[in-house]
Amino acid sequence: MNNVQQSSKRWLSLGWKVMAGWGWLNIIFAVIVPLVTLLVSPTMMTYGSDDAKFTGASWDKIVALSPELGFWIGLMMVSMCMMMIAYGILQMKVSKIPYQRGEKWAWHTLLWANLLYFIYGAGLTFTFFSRGIYGSFTSGISVGLPFLVVWVLVLIFGLWLPRRELNQ
């Protein structure tokens, strides 16, 4: 590839790396959360202080009501993380090979997968916002305002800016 083609694809060069990194982040998060939830404490990543505000029940109250309910809540998070691993693997592989080459189908696949994922995550988070809980990574459900901002930046730099550099 000559220098003209290389420089004209600067956003795509950044974009595929951002999206592949986003996939890796999802995989890492999806491995760490179940380990912490099951082996250390569910209150660190599965049922945080924002969740207690949302439900009106502390983790201790839930476990006092039913230890099995607490365990079940942890298993729900583990099952969600199982899906995040698959999402992360697909995100990373589609980004690394076809999106890096500028293939439009890869961009469309990443766009739709990430927009739907974002809408779902933002919807859950706005449910918390509607109750005055803005979050800073202290919930197993809501991603919180800081993470929504990061997510928007990932979509801008990973997909929006590179869109014009795709192969025709």
Which positions does each model-derived feature cover?
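Topology signature of small-to-medium multi-pass alpha-helical membrane proteins
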Residues: 2-168
